C-alpha cells in the first residue's frame, strides 16, 4: 500500500482545499446562470418547448 513519507504542510493542505472549493463554486455559478437563462428564455444552448395552457 502507498504511504506518504512526510506530513503535508498546513499551507499546502489549505491551498488544495481552496482549489477544490473554487471548482465547486464555479460549477454552481455556471449552473445557476444556465437556470436563469432558461427561465427567462434567453438560452442559446437549449431549446425549450413552450407549453400553452389554454
Curated annotation (Swiss-Prot):
Pfam families: Ribosomal_L32p. Keywords: Chloroplast, Plastid, Ribonucleoprotein, Ribosomal protein. GO terms for cellular component: chloroplast; large ribosomal subunit. The keyword Transmembrane does not apply. GO terms for biological process: translation. Transmembrane segments: none annotated. It is found in: Plastid, Chloroplast. GO terms for molecular function: structural constituent of ribosome. Belongs to the bacterial ribosomal protein bL32 family. PANTHER family: 50S RIBOSOMAL PROTEIN L32, CHLOROPLASTIC (PTHR36083), LARGE RIBOSOMAL SUBUNIT PROTEIN BL32C (PTHR36083:SF1). This is Large ribosomal subunit protein bL32c. It comes from Gossypium hirsutum (Upland cotton). The gene is rpl32.
Amino acid at each position: 500500500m502507498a504511504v506518504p513519507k512526510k506530513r503535508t504542510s498546513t499551507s499546502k493542505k489549505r491551498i488544495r482545499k481552496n482549489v477544490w472549493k473554487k471548482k465547486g463554486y464555479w460549477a454552481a455559478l455556471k449552473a445557476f446562470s444556465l437556470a436563469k437563462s432558461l427561465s427567462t428564455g434567453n438560452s442559446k444552448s437549449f431549446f425549450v418547448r413552450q407549453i400553452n395552457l389554454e
